Amino acid sequence: MSPPPADLDPASPDRSTAAGPAPAVPSSGRPVIPDDPPLGSAIGTAIADERSGPWLSATADLPEAALLHPRRAFVSQRVTALRTRIAEIAELVEVPDLCLYLTGSYGRFEASPYSDLDIFFMHKGTFQHNALLPVQKTLIDAALIRGCRDLGFPELTGGGQYLRIHYLDDIRSSLGGPQDDAQNFFTARMLLLLESLPLYNDALYRDVIRAMISSYYRDYSDHEKNFRPIFFQNDIMRYWKTMCLNYEHRRNRLPDDPIKHAEFHLKNFRLKFSRLLTCFSMIIAVVHLSRRAVLRDSELLALVLASPWQRLIEVARDTGSRSLLGQMVDLYVWFLDSTAAPKEQCARWIADRAIRSQAFSRASEFGGLLFTLLQRVAEGTDALRYLVM
């Protein structure tokens, strides 16, 4: 895996391997990021040390985050095995411009044995000029599905129907346009930047992220002294609002079936915890780092390579918000424990009116704490104005 450039990562399992000496942290507290850090090839125990750079010790010093460690260890172990299996797929060698990455609970380092595998394919070029032969993709898919089954992962969603290839150049050229939504480019891009974890071809994975970030920084050269990543922040807010609207739209078509209603309560519950965390951990971190100076693209790369909780842990440490962090972690671990079961069991759990009332009360409390941290890092700036207007 490719180690993140001195990333904002407090002890998380991954994104690279072989840990080298931690770069120095300047007195400003801003992360120092080498242009092209060395790439590793295996994770194992190093996975817990790598994606951290100078922030590793920070994590160890924060007992408020200790409750998250078991999930990170589980993800490290499972992803190590999956990466090893994927590296054995011979057909992938024939496609050097292809990388694979995980999103969802594995990308957030919070998966349980019941978590789905959300695997994405990203190709460096365009569909028109670089489309894989159908037989190539079929062989890769078959080997990937067989490997996931052999390792005991749950069946891929829809029997693998989402294992389509996304093409980087198509996504970048369609950013903000009609095809952005129609081709699912928007979702693929947001998940890559907010909660992804490389599975294969780490070097290309990092190149893809750099290319995506460059799209948001296209005006940087004209505003080097006062540039703000408003374009990126707007895209995140759009993603959050889209997920909220999609939930409401699906409710319009709900059949008169208590089980289906319970499943949608469960989706809403997860939206208010994991999706909220994914989006606003990045917003909070960007606002925080932008207070001191212009946020460089290399610093945004470090934020992308960090997990959602790694972003929040560093912000909390830097702003004296450890008590607030501890409250958020307690609520989030309760959420993780409550949903660590098959979907049918979780749906039955939340179908109980009293339990559901308590669950959504805690979700509201979690959202309130996240907003408090956002207000804290935005205080004295016009950051909230740009998020709202």
Question: Where do the language-model regions lie?
Answer:
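N-terminal regions immediately upstream of nucleotidyltransferase
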Residues: 1-96
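Conserved aromatic-histidine-acidic binding/catalytic patches
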Residues: 67-70, 74, 112, 124-132, ...
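Conserved catalytic core of two-metal-ion nucleotidyltransferases
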Residues: 73-93, 129-232
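Amphipathic alpha-helical scaffolding segments
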Residues: 117-127, 135-141, 293-303
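Active-site nucleotide-donor binding segment shared across nucleotidyl transfer reactions
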Residues: 83-132
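Intrinsically disordered, low-complexity segments enriched in charged and polar residues
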Residues: 6, 12-17, 22, 125-130, ...
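Conserved nucleotidyltransferase catalytic core and NTase-mimicking acidic/glycine-rich helix/loop elements
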Residues: 2-7, 26-56, 203-389
